[in-house]
């Protein structure tokens, strides 16, 4: 009887920790401001770090951009607990004008599954960027 009781107590102590173990994504920087960019620029780039502060491997399952003037690439490798990955973002201001706020959606195996980072820029005619 005591043996069964001990087994039940151990299960109650161990199993909840296993069930709660998960990857947790942390984004140290959620917005990147490119500032003033000339509309004849080829592209401007930035990086967003995705840190795994959980205790299970983190997978970036997909990265989606909100418009054709933006692209993003990322590593498809699992991110170990304590490590981080980088999402590389490019903004193409060619033939654009004005203020831009673009959203990049990052899907991971975390809760919540969908997160986002943003880029900002003020696109001006060539020679007016100063």
Description of each model-found segment:
Residues 87-95:
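Short, hydrophobic beta-strand segments
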Residues 4-15:
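Sec-dependent N-terminal signal peptides
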Residues 55-86:
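Surface-exposed binding patches on compact interaction domains or structured appendages
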Residues 97-127:
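Terminal connector regions
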Residues 21-53, 126-130:
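Beta-sheet-dominated interaction scaffolds and their linkers
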Residues 53-56, 95, 110:
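Short, acidic/polar linear motifs in exposed loop/turn regions
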Residues 46-52, 89, 102-107:
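Buried hydrophobic-core signal for structured, non-transmembrane domains
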Residues 15-21:
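Sec/Tat signal peptide C-region and signal peptidase I cleavage site
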């Amino acid at each position: 009887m005591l043996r069964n009781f001990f087994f039940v107590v151990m299960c109650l102590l161990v199993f909840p920790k296993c069930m709660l173990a998960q990857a947790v994504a942390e984004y140290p920087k959620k917005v990147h401001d490119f500032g003033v960019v000339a509309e004849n620029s080829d592209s401007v780039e930035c990086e967003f770090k995705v840190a795994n502060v959980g205790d299970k491997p983190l997978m970036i399952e997909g990265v989606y951009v909100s418009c054709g003037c933006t692209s993003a690439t990322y590593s498809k490798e699992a991110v170990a607990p304590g490590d981080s990955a980088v999402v590389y973002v490019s903004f193409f201001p060619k033939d654009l004008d004005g203020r831009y706020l673009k959203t990049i959606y990052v899907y991971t195996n975390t809760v919540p599954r969908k997160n986002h980072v943003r880029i900002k820029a003020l696109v001006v005619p060539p020679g007016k960027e100063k």
